[in-house]
Amino acid sequence: MENRNTHTHPENKAEAPTVQSSSGLSSTKKKTDLEAAVAAGQNGRADATERDSRKKPAAPRGPEKEPRHTASSQERSGEPQTQEQRPSARSKTTQDGPRELQTGQEQARPSGDFVASEGRPQPAMQTKDQQKRWQSAEAKDVQSTESCQGNTDHDLGKPCTSDSRSHPQKTNSLSEGGRPQARLQEPMPAPSSGTHKDNPQEAVPPKPKVTAEEKKAPPVLPTVPRTHKDRGEAVESKASPRPPPPPPSPPPPPPPEERDVEKKELGQGQKQRQPALAAAGTQGPGNFRRGFMKCLLEVEEQEEATHRRTLKSRALTARRSPKTVTSVPTSGPVNSSVPPLPPTLHEPSTSAPATVPSWVKPPAPGQAPIPMGTPSSVLPTPAQDQSWRWPELLPQGNERNLNYAKTRQESEEHGLFKLYQNWEERTEEHLTLKQEEAFRSYFDIFNGPGEVDARSLKNILLLIGFTFTPAQVEEALMSADVNGDGHVDFKDFLAVMTDTKRFFCSVEQNVLMDMSPPNPYTLFFEILSLLVEMLALPEVALEEITNYYQKKLKEGSSKAREMETAMGGIRQRKKIPYSSQQVENLEVPERRVLRILSRLKQQNYAANLQSPYAQVPCIPLCPRLDKKAVRRKQASHNHSVLDQCVPTSLGPDLHGFFLQPGQQGSREHSSDSRKWLSSVPARTH
């Protein structure tokens, strides 16, 4: 018995691939099964006839099996005779497939008898009961094999199904041995003509019973499903023994045939879906639709939120502040603000629709995310903060208006001062050749060595009767040194004499001579005025210099009036009084001169009209002189003119700055005067 067990155990190990691959065998498998049946029939042909005659009344399903045997015998008779001459070892090996089905039939019976799934054919040395059971099992085995083969011919992709899932077997053999069982559930075809006795090849030697040692032997585990090529080669690899399998797991595994069928179906389905999924780049159509729609909804929500924030910020900014605020740009492409799609979606991204579907709930204004790729110059203000901050600004309306008016006023004043500064600092108009020669004649009066030094300046001051200290003389020379080289040359002298600011300071100082000390800053203008009054310069030089300064005074007066108008408008709008010191600081020299003149005209005009001091002062720059009279009396009245031209005091009536030129000695008033001074001829007669 031990011998028999040792021989059958390797075959049991090699039987598992046959059981797993028997469900999907092709025509090759069908031929192999027929060869195994023929070989088995040759070994027990003599005993088959006797057993059939004895078992026919005893077998419960005997008449039901005869048509199958007859059909199988007819099929076997059509096989070529060369198949019987094949090696017996292969026939024994291929015979294991049909016999394993017989094992499932025997185990499903309630008698509890177990038949070995595999074993070598034994001679007819068994009892009658064993022969009956073997005969009935053999008949069922042949029928089930033929039905499976018939189905395989019609549909190779559908293996024979098992009844173990619908009818679980609760036998001791399943719990002890754990062997896979299978029961074929194919419908029985209609019986055909013929008897079981007519089949000479139906007899198969009986199989030995399973002993207690065989029950305790480890079961054969199912193998991994193989490809069609492996299934074709499985027949020849059955005879080779395999290493002992590991110990079985406690729960009984499902039948290997069912598991192989499920795995094959799953594998085929996955292989068919794999190209489509690889092309789409997703795990399934459901995930694709969910991911794509989610991305579209997120993009639409982000765009809608950004658009609402932009409109709201623009409206609030326009309402609360008059200043222009740079808004968030929304004219960029839509794809710039679209976040990237998930990595599982490799299809090209499409632009989001401009309108939001009706079934999409719009997000809250303050909770919508802002896209990170959107470039913006101004951060959008949250709407929730603006809603409750707006009423707080209402009581502060008056203060805001005052602050705004003050800011606007300061900006206008700054603009006016900037205009005046630019007018002062602009490049002086280029002097003509005649004008330059006229200033050259004035420069030569100092008789210096090509420059004005302290010695020559003191001599001129003594000639005209001015008294200056040496410190004041040095200060005057330093102020005249424009380039700072320590020498007052002709270039520096021209810069001083054409300086507009110095000129208007000199005019103001002449008006207020009685109350202002000598100014070294305007000393050269004072000397020029006296020299023109003394007619110490050539006639051409006097005319050019007078015309030049009259033009400068006219431009300055018009500019002062414009400044006065602008400042008056600002003062009326702001209605904020200035102190006297602020007024003095804000006024320009031209405006200050006009203000002083108007104030002096208003004070005691009638009383001071007959005063000798009401005479127009002897200020030079008057070209309308009688040339013959000047030449005739220049030598005799030189010293007296110098003494008379030294101003000691000035009367309040100084309106002679704008007198209309007429007869000699005329004192008529005119606001559109073309000449600065016109009363010098009255003194020369």
Swiss-Prot record:
Ca(2+) binds at D481, N483, D485, H487, D492. PROSITE patterns: EF_HAND_1, EF_HAND_2. Expressed in testis. Exclusively expressed in haploid spermatids and very weakly in spermatogonia, spermatocytes, and Sertoli cells as well as in interstitial cell. Residues 18-27 have a biased composition (Low complexity). This is Spermatogenesis-associated protein 21. Residues 70-108, 323-338, 374-385 have a biased composition (Polar residues). Residues 1-14, 256-266, 666-675 have a biased composition (Basic and acidic residues). Keywords: Calcium, Metal-binding. InterPro entries: EF-hand-dom_pair, EF_Hand_1_Ca_BS, EF_hand_dom, SPT21. GO terms for molecular function: calcium ion binding. Residues 468-503 form the EF-hand domain. Involved in the differentiation of haploid spermatids. It comes from Rattus norvegicus (Rat). Residues 241-255 have a biased composition (Pro residues). Residues 1-289, 302-385, 656-685 are annotated as: Disordered.
